[in-house]
Amino acid sequence: MIGPKAYIHSDRLKQNIWNIRRQIGERMLMVVVKADGYGHGAINVASVLAGEPGIIFCVFTIAEAKELREGGISNKILIFSRMQREWLDQTIEYDLWVNAAAMEDLNALREFHNNTGACPVVHLKFDT
């Protein structure tokens, strides 16, 4: 293959997380592993950091979130894409966080809760 290559060194990745951790303390830290870990394998990258305290993994699609869960990742996972009514049941099954960006999303969550008694953790996205 011709072109640039990027190498991920797990020890350096962990050191970078600890450097950030020294600045933010014990707050939760969101680590983006969407697009297959930007070509490095989402499960590979997530596995390196899964044992670190306070890590939330962020992906773009529910398929990526399910891939992490099925790959053994137990950390909290936030789906960046706008919540879709048709996959709310899977967010409960896989213990995923959703991104609500409109009143329509909140209404769908209320309806889902009224029908099932369950509701995923919600990240509210506001355009300012």
What is the meaning of each model-derived region?
Residues 4-8, 12-15, 24-128:
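Active-site-proximal beta-alpha core segment in soluble small-molecule metabolic enzymes
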Residues 1:
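Gly-rich Lys/Arg/Thr-decorated short loops/hinges at beta-loop-alpha junctions or inter-strand turns
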Residues 21:
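N-terminal nucleotide-binding beta1-loop-alpha1 segment
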